[in-house]
Amino acid sequence: MRRSSDRILVSHAGNLPRPADLDELIDGGRSRESAERKEYHERLPRAVSGIVDRQIELGVDIVNDGEYAKAGSYGGYMQERVVGYATVPADPSRKPKRAGTAERDRREFPGFYASGLWFSGSGGPIRPGFATPGEVRQIATRDTRACTEPIRYIGQSAVAEDIANLKAATRGKDVEGYIAALGPLSLGAGIHNLHYNSEEEYMQAVADACRVEYKAVTDAGLIVQVDEPEFLTTWSFYPEWTVEDLRKYLGFAVDVINHALRGLPQEQIRFHSCWGSGHRPHVHDIELKYIADLLLKINAQQYAIEAGNVRHAHEYHVWEEVKLPAGKMLMPGVISHATDLVEHPELVAERIVNYARLVGRENVQTSTDCGIGSRVGHEEVVWAKLAAMSEGAAIASRRLWGR
């Protein structure tokens, strides 16, 4: 991946607003044989070309396909690309593998969670696959998802299409391309294993499946962004855990992630994690200082971590004590997905400089906290946020390089 010696490079963390006609095709094309699905695949290359051009216009240096091929939640697309899972009847004798999302917060703010507001974006229209404000999702209790047979990746043609569309859209343009791909924890850690002899064997199989997708991306000369929010959100699923319990688990998690990354070029790998993109209090998020050293054991060249919202913006101080290894880079989020307020470019610049002064200006690139296409209320606000990030990066570059 590109390392700049004269300015701060700009990227973002994932999904971007999709054209309305593409959303309609996705919503109508759930059947594999539908006419809408065929039309969707014909429309997709032009849509990706358009969003790449839009990113370039807004000053983004490391661009993606907007995650246009990934309808709904950030990880749902893998249900079509990985087999080995099935819906099975719930077994009253089998305890839930873990608590629900944000259980620590949920216990302190039960009324807020009952409202369902945290499922929504911060306002405005909601992309297909996301709940509308105030709607409470009802989760069936009579069945559950489980691993019932060997885990295998079957998404080769789908990821090949993702790669082809992005490479065509970036050809001849002075940008790098990246594709986001789900991490093994986020794919499999919350699902019961009914097939393998142990959790370790099961999660290694999940990692093997993920690796097929990662390798396809890196073999194509693109950057793979491993999307692994569960590196930071796992704490919320186990309210009885101590920090020591979490660190023990994350030691195992690092091994799983590195198993998925084995043999792949670190210079094409960026690892992204966050504290979950739900609009919720986040008062019980695990603090970065407790796990930053474990994060750096992941075999990636770059670490993209949520850092722009009001709960975590102060955590650049962690890097006063934790030393970034030689050759590694940080990509702090300096734009928040949690608000429709557009960050001032001066604030963006200040955030960038805070990191650059601690880890070195050549070791910092800039990003959003998470994908903002689905969580910010309107696409006009998304474009304004990306423009503010680019302007802030330019201001920071002048301060850091003196020109």
Q: PLM features: residue spans?
A:
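Domain-level signal for soluble alpha/beta catalytic cores
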Residues: 1-403
